Amino acid sequence: MSAETGELIWRDRADSHPSATITGAPALNGNILYVPVSSLEVALAVNPAYECCTGRGSVVAYDTRSGDRLWQTFTIPDAPTLQSVNAAGTNMYGPSGSMVWNSPTIDHTRNQLFIGTGENMSSPADHSSDAIFAIDLTTGKVNWIYQALANDAWNTACGTNTPQSCPEEDGPDFDFGAGTLMVKTDSGRQLVVAGQKSGIVHALEPKTGKLVWKNRVGRGGIQGGVHFGMAAGNGKIYVPISDGPDGREYDTPDRPGLHALNADTGEILWYSPAPNVCAGRDFCDPGVSQAISVISGKVFAGAMDGVMRAHDADTGKVIYQIDTTKPFTSISGEMATGGSFGGGSGAVAKNGLVVISSGYGIYAHMPGNMLMMLSVE
C-alpha cells in the first residue's frame, strides 16, 4: 500500500492452504520482501474427523515494486501424502508442519537468510522440524539445515479427550518460535544464535550450520523455554525464559526470568530470576515469554505477570519496573488496563521514549489492552 494514501498497490496470498497464516514480520532486503508462512492447522487436529495435516511452512520472496513472486521455498519439499487412518476412520497425511512462526534474519555477507521451524504436525516426523534453515536470498535454495531435535511431531489432539489424531511421536512441541540472531562476539566471530522452546540456546557457524555451542538455560515447555524472542549486545546474548506450568512433568528445574550468556562460549554470566508476585491471580505466572529489547544499556523484559522490568544489561539488576495490570487513565480520559506481556513484539524505542504493549489474553494468560509510552530517563 501507499504509505501516504493507503491506496492498494498489489496483493497476493502467500500460500493457498486454507489454514495458512503469517505470524512473523516479513524481512525487507533492498527491493525484495521475504515472507514467512505458518499455519493454524495444528489446532484443527483436536477434531478426530479432521484430515490432519496438509500444511507446510515456507518462505516466499516478492519483488516489492511489482508484487511478482520470485520464489517460494517449503520447509518440507514434497506435499504431504496419505500415511494412515486414525481410530475414528479419518485419513491422516504427512509429513506436515515445520511452520515458520518467526521473522527471517538476513545474512548479507553470505547472501542468505535464516529461519527457525516448528514441530511436525503429523506422523512421520522428518528432518525439517525444530530446525534452523539457511536459504539463498536470490534463488531460494536451501544451503543447510541444522535440526536441534528429531522426532518431534505434535498437534492439539495430544493430551486431550479426543487424541485420535495425535501423532505417534506425541511431542514434545519444542519449536523455534523466536527469530534467530546474527551476533558478532567479542572475539570477532559471527554466529547464528537461536533459542528454542526446549529452553536450549544454540549457536551455529553461519556458513555451514555447524554447532559451535549450546546451553540449556531453561526447563522448557509448550510455551517455552524461549518463546518469542531473544536479544544481543556487547558480546552477550539475553535470553528470556517463561517455563510456565503446562501440565507436564520435567526432570530439570524451572528457571523463569532473564539470563545473559557469553556469546563466544554460551556460558551464563548472570541470571535474574522472575519474582512471583501473582498472589493467586488467575492466568498470572512469573517468567518472560514476550520478545525482549536492549535499549541504552538496559534490557526491557515484559513478564507474564504484567510487569515490565528494565534490567541493567551488565549485571541483570532490575533498575525500573511498572505493573501494567493496574488501571491507568488514558490520554482519551478512559481507564486502560494491561495484562500479561506476550507475543513477538517487545519494547520499541524512539527519540528517548519506549513504547510497550500490554495484554495477552490467549493460552491461559491475562487479557488486557494498553499501549504505554515511557521515558528512558
Outline where the language-model segments fall.
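Extracytoplasmic/lumenal domain signature
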Residues: M1-A20, N29-N31, V42, V46-P95, ...
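Long, structured ligand/cofactor-binding scaffold of large enzymes
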Residues: A25
